[in-house]
Amino acid sequence: MKFLYLFLFAVFAWTSDAIVRIPLKKFRSIRRTLSDSGLNVEQLLAGTNSLQHNQGFPSSNAPTPETLKNYMDAQYYGEIGLGTPVQMFTVVFDTGSSNLWLPSIHCSFTDIACLLHHKYNGAKSSTYVKNGTEFAIQYGSGSLSGYLSQDSCTIGDIVVEKQLFGEAIKQPGVAFIAAKFDGILGMAYPRISVDGVPPVFDMMMSQKKVEQNVFSFYLNRNPDTEPGGELLLGGTDPKYYTGDFNYVPVTRQAYWQIHMDGMSIGSQLTLCKDGCEAIVDTGTSLITGPPAEVRALQKAIGAIPLIQGEYMIDCKKVPTLPTISFNVGGKTYSLTGEQYVLKESQGGKTICLSGLMGLEIPPPAGPLWILGDVFIGQYYTVFDRESNRVGFAKST
């Protein structure tokens, strides 16, 4: 019996004390910030395909560039440090991309987005190493560009040595001006990393900085409580979920891509009838899918299209909306109307918006569904690089 107690204590210690915890704060998305300012987001993005971007540029031996999503709806960020002594930055921990980039002290004085955010200064770091390789991420509104540098990267209690990252000297359009975060820390696979830069978590694994090669996200969907969530490096925390994790294999090691068996909207509509692919993406607030299917879904729940690609729902009808169910790995993950409808303040009034949006992701990467924060907020999610799988458990 004493041995059993010791064993249980060891297991609990791994799930709670051996992991590194990064608090996440929730902020108002770029889309909502621009809308609050009276700017027409659709006009700003006209011809840009909603700031879609390519991650991973072609070379003689590189994969085809893949169009994914934007950061217009990102809502959670946390802090990291770069250099010695540490320079602090806020970043979106994004499982839908693989690069770390931050604004550079050398950005142009005409780059307003850069001027409004924290900037990395290699001259103030004793561990900085010049690299100089040019990098660029193609957004619809232009190219975010700069050059690579190397320095130590501090995340919680972990110090990743010799991390390559992008110093951004040019940020496109107005979108990043309104961003509450300084940069992006990608947590997807190396395959989609621009310039073949090893992602931060890959460096953690190779330097044996984590107990287990997994990380997990808890996203708090209650806007009145703090913290906004937590990123756990090296494990999971039982206080954030009930029951057991159900795991599904990663079908393509680029994004955190999984197979979805189907979707249903109450008894009214079935989507993804022959199965489809989805990616699990912490950098996207909404759930997105092929536009034609999402339009059918919005019609089924009685949503009214707005000019910005969003859909509005009568707040009085939210409690009676049909349940949306996602069938993944033989399990059904359901969202009620209260869970997939977003309540926003606009002009002093509360409006209800659908948490789903159409997004065209063409072949060869797409079509894809994106399970963003609307989904992850209800299902605590673990990303397992050891076994290349994703696990879901009901959030507490």
Swiss-Prot record:
Biological role: Acid protease active in intracellular protein breakdown.
Proregion span(s): 19-61
Signal sequence extent: 1-18
Name the UniProt record assigns to this protein: Cathepsin D
Sorted UniProt keywords: Aspartyl protease, Disulfide bond, Glycoprotein, Hydrolase, Lysosome, Protease, Signal, Zymogen
Listed Pfam families: A1_Propeptide (PF07966), Asp (PF00026)
Compartments in which it is found: Lysosome
Domain (Peptidase A1): residue spans on this chain: 76-393
Description of how activity is regulated: Inhibited by pepstatin.
Thermal activity profile: Optimum temperature is 37 degrees Celsius.
EC number: 3.4.23.5
GO cellular component, one term: lysosome
MF-aspect GO terms: aspartic-type endopeptidase activity
pH dependence: Optimum pH is 2.5 with hemoglobin as substrate.
Enzyme kind, highest EC tier: hydrolase
Subunit: Monomer.
Gene3D superfamilies per UniProt: Acid Proteases
One GO biological process term: proteolysis
Catalyzed reactions per annotation: Specificity similar to, but narrower than, that of pepsin A. Does not cleave the 4-Gln-|-His-5 bond in B chain of insulin
Active site: 94, 281
RNA-binding in keyword set: no
